[in-house]
Amino acid sequence: MINIFEVNETNKMIEQEMLDVRTITLGISLLDCCDTDLDKLNTRIYEKITRVAKNLVAVGKEIEREYGIPIVNKRISVTPIALVGGQACSSPEDFVTIAKTLDRAAKEVGVNFLGGYSALVSKGMTKAERDLILSIPQALACTERICSSVNIGSTRTGINMDAVKLMGEIVLSTAEATKDQNSLGCAKLVVFCNAPDDNPFMAGAFHGVTEGDAVINVGVSGPGVVKHALEAVRGKNFEVLCETVKKTAFKVTRMGQLVALEASERLGIPFGIVDLSLAPTPSVGDSVAEILEEMGLESVGAPGTTAALALLNDQVKKGGVMASSFVGGLSGAFIPVSEDQGMIDAVNRGALTLEKLEAMTSVCSVGLDMIAIPGNTPATTIAGIIADEAAIGMINQKTTAVRLIPVIGKDIGDTVEFGGLLGYAPVQPVNKFSCANFINRGGRIPAPIHSFKN
């Protein structure tokens, strides 16, 4: 039985501790839109998205009003466009027309982001997939709401190093194409290893081919709630610490489950998953870094940071799986630098380096996220960082990703402003030694021995 204390506790979480539903993401399959005629394909894509998603934003606002739960974003993910446009597109420019159509549809239904301008190339690349990848810089430069992702490896297939090399070049080209906006295009481009089919979070969301025609996935956010709960157990042993995180994660996820089921029922679209991720914002008090510091670190980046993050990630999952029948997506703690005030402060005080962030990604849900680096960083160095991150994901059988922003015209120590939820970031140094000869070998890194389970 729910008592009045629990009701007040939830209200306090929302009003004072920044508890919110970060996103309701509607996944839409576009496989039935495929056509050999590009104009027909674009028409079908626009018509399907605007038909299926027409009530998404209104329903989200309705649930917000009725339950008093803030729902920050309403978003859409679609089938990877390299699969949808393969028959009709014969050049990168053809794919850009689809990006413009998706952008128009997103604007029409009122969502702030649409993900799925994507290619899955973990083992090899078709011509269509290569064309889509080559179109990414132009597509992100001429659209407002489109997010792009490329899966370049997996535990079962290994790492496609040809794709890794190409993505190093594409990240740099995207930075150049959007340099008048502080290279903002790179904030909407993610390179994955082991990308999940049901991720509700941008910029890596796409509607996987294993999914149905449409599905509702929800991502929750509650770093402020977890930090506040830990303040009450300061100095207690690890058992108490873990129990506190776990119970708090349960409450946060329960709210996400409620919103997901309500949205599903009102839209007449099946519920997919709740993503258990703790997603920070640039607001003070809504930070994953501050949780780690509340555990006892002087600053994020200090010795013990990776252990603290591993503990947090595991307890969030243990609490979350009790609260929802279906969990998925990325599910863990996000550590984006520009979107987390505590991370920004740690970088500015010299406590948190790119290498330490890489170590942290081995125990949390995503990877090197929203990190600004000098605009003159070589493409092969970016590719090397992508390869390192993919190797962590491949060997550990987990999702890892890279969202680096080489800011054209900026150098180490400069600050770059992205605005809104994307925040701002200090430009961090990158190792100056070259990996070009390694990246230029080409081919594939084979799957690890423990992937051979048949």
From Swiss-Prot:
Coiled coil: none annotated. SUPFAM superfamilies: PFL-like glycyl radical enzymes (SSF51998). CDD domains: RNR_PFL_like_DUF711 (cd08025). Belongs to the UPF0210 family. This is UPF0210 protein Mlab_1030. It comes from Methanocorpusculum labreanum (strain ATCC 43576 / DSM 4855 / Z). The lineage of its organism: Archaea, Methanobacteriati, Methanobacteriota, Stenosarchaea group, Methanomicrobia.
